[in-house]
Amino acid sequence: GHGGVALQNAAMKGDASRCSANLPVPLRRNSKHSKTCDFSFSGLKTAVLYAIRQHDEDVFFKNSAMVCDFAASFQDVAVQHLVDRTRKAIELCKRENLEMSSLVVSGGVAANTLLRERLSELEDVNLVFPPLSLCTDNGVMIAWAAHEARRTSSSPPPLFTEDEITSLEISPRSPFGIYDGED
């Protein structure tokens, strides 16, 4: 698996309210970006680093309850940031009279259960989540997006069936070509 899966698994075993770290929701207060749709996790990553350094790292990482509580707190804050920014983007579309019929939430982050739950609470937007099996590999996500675009258009039929797309072997380390040994 990847980091997102490990984070979610740990967070599901933890309780954010038990975490001693007070992690900030990025770009929320007193920032020139607080009213934009920008995403930034740099401040959150720095806060995580400092919070972990407040503990003896050997003790911290051997205490699974502490790690799980910390993971739950981090996930909660990261998801809140994503939801805040998504809400701002939806508000901007409405304010600018931009037509938006649906919002597709895709990529690896779309596999996060908490993010799916929290985004589903947003009103006035039709959310589309690809099947979880397609939320791990960007290449497959691109294929799925193309399939959906063709499926919903009045022009040519899909190039691939959903079964053909979902039967693709997914590997996070697939090579792009032959390495020639030169940089």
What are these regions (language model features)?
Residues 1-183:
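Acidic, glycine-enriched active-site microenvironments
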